[in-house]
Amino acid sequence: MENMGAFQFRGVQLDLARQMETLDFIYEFIDFIGKSGYNTLVLYLEGRIKTKSFPYPVAGEYYTPEEMKAVVSYASKKNIDVIPVVSVLGHAELFLKHKEMKHLAEIRGDAKSTLEETINHVFCPSLPETFDFIKNYLSEIAAIFPSKYFHVGCDEVWDFGCCSICRDRIHNGESHGDIFAKYITDMHGFIKNELGKDMIVWDDLFECYPNALAKIPNDVILCCWNYDRRVDLPKAHFKSRLEEDLLAKYEKLGFKYIFAPSTFLVANIESFTTYSSKYSPLGGLLTVWEKSLNFMYEVMPLVHYAGRLWSGKDINFNDAIKDVFGCGDNIFFDALRSNYEIKATHPTRLSPLSYLAGPITEFEAIIKSSSETNSDIFSLFLERCINDNARNMLEDILVSLEWKKIMFKLRTVVEELYSFDEKCPDIARRKYITSEMAEMIDRYLKKKLDQWKRFRKGISSAGIEKTFTEFRNKVLELAETSAKAAGVLKVKFFLPDMYNAQKCKFTIVFEDGSTEIAAEGIFKNYEMNDAYFIYKFPYYTTRQPVSVRIESWLYGGLGIAYLEIISRKSCFYPVSICNVKGNVQSIQHILVNDLRFCYLGETDMNALLQMPELTKRKHGLTLVLGERQEE
């Protein structure tokens, strides 16, 4: 990459809201980022600090003000500024999970969640009590962090304009964007005038409410996040992926801004940095998210690379990585780069039936082969690492690759369990292969818990134990449940945008008029690289299916290219369509097994954001089935 010089703001974020880290690790991380060229640590806290105004967190789920002051003091000695992030609108679940706080939630009384969220995560922006609490809490947090900056979040606010007070404001002429702009403006006035700090916000809600941007003070600092593989021109996250030159727009309106890539992909960091360097950002913020099932060590090589890149010192990935590990060659460097690509495009699945997705795809085969090769390469270098910290990083990567082995094994095992041909296993075989999988998961969990004891000593590991133990038990249950399945509903989906959140329900109707819901949920491609993907949904009614009813609602729409039912004796395929309702486009395509697709739902994202009631509208059709006897 071309050397673009040092950015003024060189930050990295540590997500302590989703997973607490020990103070010792935070100190270690500060040492690491200081050597990597960063001058700012952003602590994503939400409601992680217990204070007088927020005394509800119980032991083991909070930091004290004194602990955070110690972190700030330590960082200051390393010339690292520490900025807190307290979510004052969305992502407020750490606050709103407490019964004493529920009266401040947007979803209260008769209010309904826009995207059918099961937890309260949004403060009501219309309640004076909300602002009173937030002012008190932010004042306490500001006293801990002397930084000139204060980050208030405000991203991904799904339940907005839902409560009776907000609805009345909209009925009386305000728009969702007006309500958002007023809230941001009021928050800015408090932070600027009473706390004496510059306010930072995430920028994605301004995609949803573009008119709000011109209504807020332009000394609000916008944090522009984008996690696409290549950021040649940013695409909106929640508005039909509208392409827009956001940084040019922000400069034209006089805003200061920070660009924020993620540790998901090397290419994301590099391309977003290149794009941003054409303009005049304050700098970059590398965002690290949600490490409750993983550890920070795995991403620390990328943290180092971004820090060197932004400080204008190292512009070569290989040199930066060799600096971390004290060893390596081109094979090692290429393996590490590809490993981050694999991690981003093949995330963890924690539902056994999500592995029932047809034959392994060409892309999965490439990932499987690359993962196995990378594991062999990293194992060779483990003992050559320059220090314990480097070994922890490589070990963490190797343990994650073990999970990849489990995932690919599950892909073949679950397909075998739900096969309905001559390969269909007997109950003894079913119990054997599920027990074998359970043993693999047990060994993996033991390694994760051993890591936990070393990396997060004193912090409860109940979450990770519960998650993987429940997953293991569900895998064991497949031996019995798969044997009872009468067949599977196989659906070929088309989803052009991974940010869509369109719910879909498939109901099978049988010859006697009885029904069974085969599946209901939001379905996405776990590979994250192809708009087309397959899922198979088991059903258990032994009577002959005659039709499938499809219903779809919520956000963004969903395409269905084809579906069929495969039972123990027959195959059933769509022959005609009836009972169409709502917005269903290109209906006839669903009758032919090719790459054309029928699309259900609203495609106008802007309309959905401005009128959330549209997300409740049902779109659907019924497919009448014909029977094709298996030879």
Predicted regions and their residues:
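Mature N-terminal, pre-catalytic/accessory segment of carbohydrate-active enzymes
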Residues: 1-46, 62-63, 148, 387-493, ...
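Feature activates predominantly on carbohydrate-active enzymes
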Residues: 1-194, 200
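Surface-exposed loop/edge segments in extracytoplasmic proteins
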Residues: 513-520, 570-574
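Extracellular carbohydrate recognition and processing domains
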Residues: 516-540, 582-586, 591
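Short, surface-exposed beta-strand/strand-loop-strand elements in extracellular ectodomains
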Residues: 502-513, 561-566
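Substrate-binding groove of N-acetylhexosamine-processing glycoside hydrolases
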Residues: 31, 70-73, 128-139, 143, ...
